[in-house]
């Protein structure tokens, strides 16, 4: 995520702000229907004359791929060894606490109601990025799992949160705000869940971002169609639990698909409210550009639908480095140490995938 024209924090990694892909070949696995779709896009530059012949070639490629995949699954069993991971941050603990206090000053002055401040953790890359992704699928399964290999860097993610979705003419945003760690026992887990739902600070923060989500959905929905279908429910993941709500609206077709995406970008749950002033404060207080973190990852489909998630619980592997960024929502009564600990807890799932 980048604020146009702002250069207060440094760009320390050569990673693009945007990367768009238009693949020729797609393999779509529908896990609910237990079906696999193999799609081969044909473009004019290929100058194909016999499409039936091309179809048979593609089918042969698919069967060959299936055979190779089966062989790899049988012969490529590796033993995972536990490793001690040394982690450092781009922000010292004391500086992060100061960042929180400075944000609270801005809130007191009336500049903002809330802002999400983050820190970026860095560790040595101890295994292949694709192996980290495979481990995440087991240890931290999430609604959005993704792996992108751009040769000079890789993006690995297990995001819990929709950015904006258009499906069946319905716009969906699903704000997540409010966090507790998972308990070590069932009773401790229940304690944290109850504590989260009784925390006035967390509830007020979530309500604020839920209202922001309703406003975002309303920008590209038909009048009086926006509604909250889930409100203040708890979703649990491997290391943390969250308060989650769900907002839908009937898509107004006078808006383009791209405009619909921008209606919710960047998400208030990773920036703050009001968004623009919150982003200015983020740029002032954070030490390095966020880049992938808090941005959007997803697809636009040929059928006119799209689905995107927020780049949370997302790591970047570059050369021999592994980067994970995590944030916490700051409001008027935030406790700096508690917000610091929240960022650490959110980053644990990805850091532990290195072990």
Model-derived regions, located:
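Extended alpha-helical targeting/anchoring segments
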Residues: 6-7, 11-355
């Amino acid at each position: 995520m980048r604020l146009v024209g702002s250069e207060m924090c440094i760009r320390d990694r050569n990673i693009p702000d945007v990367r768009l892909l238009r693949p020729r070949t797609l393999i779509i696995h529908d896990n609910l229907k237990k079906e696999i779709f193999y799609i081969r896009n044909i473009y004019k530059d290929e100058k194909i004359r016999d499409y039936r012949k091309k179809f048979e070639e593609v089918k042969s490629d698919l069967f060959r791929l299936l055979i190779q995949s089966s062989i790899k699954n049988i012969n490529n069993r590796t033993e995972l060894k536990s490793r001690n991971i040394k982690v450092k941050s781009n922000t010292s603990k004391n500086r992060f606490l100061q960042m929180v206090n400075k944000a609270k000053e801005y809130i007191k002055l009336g500049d903002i109601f809330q802002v999400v401040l983050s820190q970026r953790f860095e560790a040595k890359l101890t295994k292949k990025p694709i192996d980290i992704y495979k481990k995440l699928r087991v240890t931290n399964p999430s609604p959005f799992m993704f792996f992108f290999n751009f040769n000079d860097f890789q993006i690995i993610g297990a995001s819990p949160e929709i950015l904006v979705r258009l499906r069946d003419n319905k716009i969906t945003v699903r704000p997540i705000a409010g966090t507790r760690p998972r308990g070590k026992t069932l009773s401790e887990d229940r304690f944290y869940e109850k504590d989260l739902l009784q925390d006035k600070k967390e509830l007020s923060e979530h309500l604020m971002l839920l209202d922001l989500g309703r406003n975002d959905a309303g920008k590209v929905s038909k009048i009086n169609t926006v509604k909250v279908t889930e409100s203040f429910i708890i979703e649990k993941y491997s290391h943390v639990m969250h308060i989650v709500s769900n907002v839908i609206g009937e898509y107004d077709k006078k808006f383009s698909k791209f405009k619909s995406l921008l209606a919710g970008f960047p998400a208030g749950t990773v920036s703050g409210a009001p968004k623009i002033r919150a982003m200015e404060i983020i740029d002032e207080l954070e030490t390095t550009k966020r880049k992938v973190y808090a941005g959007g990852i997803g697809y636009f489909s040929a059928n006119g639908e799209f689905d995107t998630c927020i780049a949370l619980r997302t790591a970047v592997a570059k050369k021999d480095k592994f980067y994970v960024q995590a944030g916490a929502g700051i409001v008027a009564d935030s406790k700096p140490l508690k917000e610091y600990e929240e960022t650490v807890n959110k980053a644990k799932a990805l850091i532990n995938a290195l072990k």
